[in-house]
């Protein structure tokens, strides 16, 4: 399977998905740590892809997403953004609402 097809499949199969460095429990950078922590505080299931374990995805995703950095949060096939946007939405209460609605829809 080509990298672009892998990315599209991951995004379509996971209603809430974060591409990050490391894992939510063992993040490998501060931005990924803060972003995944905000997601975990929302208490909804989400998927993740450790881009350090998938250099092909790490290389291809920024072009596909038109977003140059990681982490990247995808919700129902749409790119939400990176760490700053995730944290801003969390602090405003918007992330919790969005993720709760999506999780309920896909439960």
Curated annotation (Swiss-Prot):
Keywords: 2Fe-2S, Cytoplasm, Iron, Iron-sulfur, Metal-binding, Redox-active center. It comes from Haemophilus influenzae (strain 86-028NP). NCBIfam families: Grx4 family monothiol glutaredoxin. GO terms for molecular function: 2 iron, 2 sulfur cluster binding; disulfide oxidoreductase activity; metal ion binding. InterPro entries: Glutaredoxin, GRX_PICOT-like, Monothiol_GRX, Monothiol_GRX-rel, Thioredoxin-like_sf. PANTHER family: GLUTAREDOXIN FAMILY MEMBER, MONOTHIOL GLUTAREDOXIN-S14, CHLOROPLASTIC. Homodimer. One of its GO terms (cellular component) is cytoplasm. The keyword Disulfide bond does not apply. This is Glutaredoxin 4. Residues 4-106 form the Glutaredoxin domain. It is found in: Cytoplasm.
């Amino acid at each position: 399977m080509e990298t672009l097809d892998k990315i599209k499949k991951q995004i379509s199969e996971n209603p809430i998905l974060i591409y990050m460095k490391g894992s939510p429990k063992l993040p490998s950078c501060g931005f990924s740590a803060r972003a995944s922590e905000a997601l975990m505080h929302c208490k909804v299931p989400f998927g993740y892809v450790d881009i350090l374990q998938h250099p092909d995805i790490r290389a291809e995703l920024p072009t596909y997403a038109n977003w140059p950095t990681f982490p990247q949060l995808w919700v129902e096939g749409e790119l939400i953004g990176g760490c700053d946007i995730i944290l801003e939405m969390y602090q405003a209460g918007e992330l919790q609402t969005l993720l709760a609605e999506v999780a309920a829809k896909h439960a």
